[in-house]
Swiss-Prot record:
Family matches, as InterPro entries: 2Fe-2S_ferredoxin-like_sf, 2Fe-2S_ferredoxin-type, 2Fe2S_fd_BS, Beta-grasp_dom_sf
Gene3D superfamilies found in the cross-reference section: 3.10.20.30
Cofactor(s) required for function per UniProt: [2Fe-2S] cluster
The keyword Metal-binding appears for this protein: yes
Protein name per Swiss-Prot or TrEMBL: Uncharacterized ferredoxin-like protein bbp_166
2Fe-2S ferredoxin-type domain sequence ranges: 4-87
Entry note: cofactor: Binds 1 [2Fe-2S] cluster.
Keyword Metal-binding tagged: yes
Phylogenetic placement of the source organism: Bacteria, Pseudomonadati, Pseudomonadota, Gammaproteobacteria, Enterobacterales
A Pfam family reported for this protein in Swiss-Prot or TrEMBL: Fer2
Residues annotated as transmembrane: none
């Protein structure tokens, strides 16, 4: 499988990963990027970040917290390609 990347705009960090069925927050945490998070199920919205480019998927849980356009919830979304985010 081809490696994809997560580019984090506000700290110029690039994370390379092999697409798997794991949440975005898990990938970030494995790379020492810790976000505020409480419920890890999309209810509270504390992990909300901006998706500037790319796509995320909500397979098992769709977030219930209110959000603005381009807001995503890394605790319950997965990715399958490269993305650009702002934390």
């Amino acid at each position: 499988m081809i490696n994809s990347k997560i580019i984090i705009l506000n700290n110029n960090k690039v994370i390379y990963y092999k697409p798997q069925n794991i949440t975005l927050i898990s990938i970030l945490e494995k790379n020492d990027i810790i976000l505020d998070s409480q419920c890890k199920q999309g209810y509270c919205g504390s992990c909300r970040i901006k998706l500037l480019k790319g796509h995320v998927y909500y397979k098992n849980i769709f977030p219930l917290a209110s959000c603005k356009p381009k807001d995503i919830f890394p605790c319950c979304c997965t990715i399958s390609g490269s993305i650009l985010i702002k934390i």
